[in-house]
Amino acid sequence: MKTQFTPKTRKVAVIGTGFVGSSYAFSMVNQGIANELVLIDMNKEKAEGEARDINHGMPFATPMKIWAGDYKDCADADLAVITAGANQAPGETRLDLVEKNVKIFECIVKDIMNSGFDGIILVATNPVDILAHVTQKVSGLPNGRVIGSGTILDTARFRYLLSDYFEVDSRNVHAYIMGEHGDTEFPVWSHAQIGGVKLEHFINTAAIEKEPDMQHLFEQTRDAAYHIINRKGATYYGIAMGLVRITKAILDDENSILTVSALLEGQYGISDVYIGVPAIINKNGVRQIIELNLTPHEQQQLEHSASILKQTRDRAFV
């Protein structure tokens, strides 16, 4: 099996056409990133309906071939994006989904690989860190070619809330959320900047994490999914846009730094766990994990998050 590959047709296979999968497909068409997009779902009628609906808007978008297919269509895909699985219910944590979705994923990944697929797999289903690890184990693909969406959405939420608070363009806010995509995630205050200026200069204190407004912003970030689920039942637009961003970094060989779920192998002193960290993403998947110089408290938070993920993973998947 190759450790590197050259994109062939810019073909993407989407497994799961629920809220996230269909939103991802719609976003892909609007941004014109791929040439081919195949929608795969156990409910073939649903996949067919989504493909037809999106195709009818093609005169307003960049030309792209979209159809409802089967796992055999993964054979020559550059990227397989998995959004299928049980959804997070109100009051349910992402980790509560483990047992249900591990079983689903074992079947999905085997079907993808049995097609002859030899590209990159991007996992979006929760708990994403654990399911990315399951995907890597079952697929046998090189570590860097199995990526979880990780904390890309949490980081985007964090940057948006900071930009709203300080009244600046969110594209000029540089700050990361690391760790589990879930309750043990944490903000990397020590590297938060606005326009190249450290965040502490905007609030006149070095103890950012103790500043009430900043703590509230992080809590809003961490708990955002719960608030959205309680109001509309599910989150899908934001994560779909995040998945498209990762897709673009892969297909366009961008070498972009994004907070994805990647397998740590000694980085940050942690091994054998997929977790949200900044990483360089290009046509081969994860090119390199960026090791930030964390404060002792931030390092402790990352280790705690990794420990929780390992414990939960080991109970559900060995």
From Swiss-Prot:
It is found in: Cytoplasm. GO terms for cellular component: cytoplasm. It holds the Pfam family Ldh_1_C. PROSITE patterns: L_LDH (PS00064). CDD domains: HicDH_like. Its EC number is 1.1.1.27. Beta-D-fructose 1,6-bisphosphate binds at residues 159, 174. NAD(+) binds at residues 20, 41, 46, 71, 85-86, 124-126, 149. One of its GO terms (biological process) is glycolytic process. Coiled coil: none annotated. The active site is at residue 181. Substrate binds at residues 88, 94, 126-129, 154-157, 235. Belongs to the LDH/MDH superfamily. LDH family. PANTHER family: L-2-HYDROXYCARBOXYLATE DEHYDROGENASE (NAD(P)(+)) (PTHR43128), L-LACTATE DEHYDROGENASE (PTHR43128:SF16). Catalyzes the conversion of lactate to pyruvate. This is L-lactate dehydrogenase. It comes from Priestia megaterium. The lineage of its organism: Bacteria, Bacillati, Bacillota, Bacilli, Bacillales.
